[in-house]
């Protein structure tokens, strides 16, 4: 995600339309910031899941992993889709890195269970009575 965000920011700075970089458009700057926020949310949740790896309660570990997987999946999808939009047609060509990054982020979203699977798993772990939470 970080590489795709950096590639997108660089593209916004160098691609010119009507003689000015498209990155000078405030709307595109906001989209870039939204991508950065999603990236940082994913990093934070991954760090949280890593910290919870030492938690003695297996239910709490599973909750942390599922929560991280949901956030990483959502962030990956958002960053990938936004990058493709900001790059325009070149964003999905085989010759350009952005398309490859987007495909990889899509694959990551479905590794070890989909985002939806982990959202349901998290909800079940959170709402199940304590004697059923194993």
Where does each model-flagged region fall?
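Alpha-helical interface subdomain recognition
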Residues: 1-134
């Amino acid at each position: 995600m970080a590489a795709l965000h950096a590639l997108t920011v660089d593209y916004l700075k160098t691609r010119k339309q009507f003689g000015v970089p498209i990155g000078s458009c405030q709307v595109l700057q906001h989209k870039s910031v939204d991508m950065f926020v999603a990236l940082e949310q994913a990093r934070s949740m991954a760090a949280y899941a890593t910290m919870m790896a030492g938690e003695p309660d297996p239910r709490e570990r599973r909750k942390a992993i599922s929560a991280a997987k949901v956030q990483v999946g959502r962030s990956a999808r958002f960053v990938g889709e936004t990058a493709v939009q900001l790059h325009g047609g070149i964003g999905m060509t085989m010759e350009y890195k952005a398309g490859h990054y987007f495909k990889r982020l899509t694959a990551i979203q479905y590794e070890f269970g989909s985002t939806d699977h982990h959202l349901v798993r998290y909800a079940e772990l959170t709402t199940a009575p304590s004697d059923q939470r194993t």
